[in-house]
Curated annotation (Swiss-Prot):
GO molecular function, one term: ATP binding
Database matches in Gene3D superfamilies: ATP-grasp fold, A domain, ATP-grasp fold, B domain, Succinyl-CoA synthetase domains
Transit peptide interval: 1-2
Name recorded for this polypeptide: Succinate--CoA ligase [ADP-forming] subunit beta, mitochondrial
A GO cellular component entry from the record: succinate-CoA ligase complex
PROSITE patterns from the UniProt entry: ATP_GRASP, SUCCINYL_COA_LIG_3
A Pfam family recorded for this sequence: ATP-grasp_2
Location relative to the cell: Mitochondrion
Family according to the record: Belongs to the succinate/malate CoA ligase beta subunit family. ATP-specific subunit beta subfamily.
Binding site residues for Mg(2+): N208, D222
Keywords, alphabetical: ATP-binding, Ligase, Magnesium, Metal-binding, Mitochondrion, Nucleotide-binding, Transit peptide, Tricarboxylic acid cycle
Keyword presence, Endoplasmic reticulum: no
Source organism: Columba livia (Rock dove)
Amino acid sequence: RRLSLHEYLSMGLLQEAGISVPHGVVARTPDEAYKIAKEIGSKDLVIKAQVLAGGRGKGTFEGGLKGGVKIVFSPEEAKAVSSRMIGKKLFTKQTGEKGRICNQVFVCERRYPRREYYFAITMERSFQGPVLIGSSQGGVNIEDVAAENPDAIIKEPIDIVEGIKKEQAVRLAQKMGFPSNLVDEAAENMIKLYNLFLKYDATMIEINPMVEDASGVVMCMDAKINFDSNSAYRQKKIFDMQDWTQEDERDRQAAKADLNYIGLDGNIGCLVNGAGLAMATMDIIKLHGGTPANFLDVGGGATVHQVTEAFKLITSDKKVLAILVNIFGGIMRCDVIAQGIVVAVKDLDLKIPVVVRLQGTRVDDAKALITASGLKILACDDLDEAAKMVVKLSEIVTLAKQAHLDVKFQLPI
């Protein structure tokens, strides 16, 4: 999992780092938006919906308001527009039909750019480290620019040990087309952004656009920052900023239980240890005509509690008609997984078929636990056979539902 912050929080981090950004304040009610607009004192303001999704500007709110980024010209208008955003769901291409709730808006001064540029820092495997990315074409979808004109994207790899050098930032600013009198200022902003990237264990910082504004100042008009979830233990300040209202409830529960979970569209639940084995398990389910309902990696040191929580996560998805547990016990002990399965099946009064494939450390103890439980858990030593079995069982349950038959795999028998 990666952490994404709201724009106003990202802009706050930039401001702390001494990077030029437009003045703005977050508002959580229309009345707050009115008050902030009045305090800013400008007749030109921008109201930005704070929703963790791309394409806000082209989105639509429930209630009919078009666009999650609006220009307003008075505190009264700021209040009126905010009232149509706050507490409403915004639907974009990225959110799909579920939409995402807007709980706050960012009220900021409007700046007039002479030119717009694109700038980002990300980790890239081909360079085995961080890379600066720039383009003279900012303020637009950079993926479209890359597809239509790949030469417009400039990359500058950074040696992770030596760090960024001023000549690298200057070279990139020149290639991006900054006027000669602003090259040094643009380069200084890039260096500050790189230092921010390292300080907070970011995996990406995207500024779109970075601009030369009408007063001749280089400014970052927007900021998107992603953080490495592995750094949560030392980036408490950052991870405490996470807005869980923007996440699926299952993602929240998975994070709480320290499980790697991603919900999918299928009907076969998967519980696996190890990301590689989890992906291979999903592949083999697809190979035999099934569709995985999730990616779920319990890791190498899962406890009975975590396995139970994993089952709760899987079964909270009402599309799930069968479950495949695939464990290769190296560090992970098979008997711990078996205890978790037995506890979960009993606690949840599970009525859907569970196929279990266990191999490795203490596998015989695990099989004995499952047998002694008296539960109808279907064991299989071969992964290919286990996948075929769970796909077939999901098809049986599907047919029963289509025929309006109350066919359940009663556990225990």
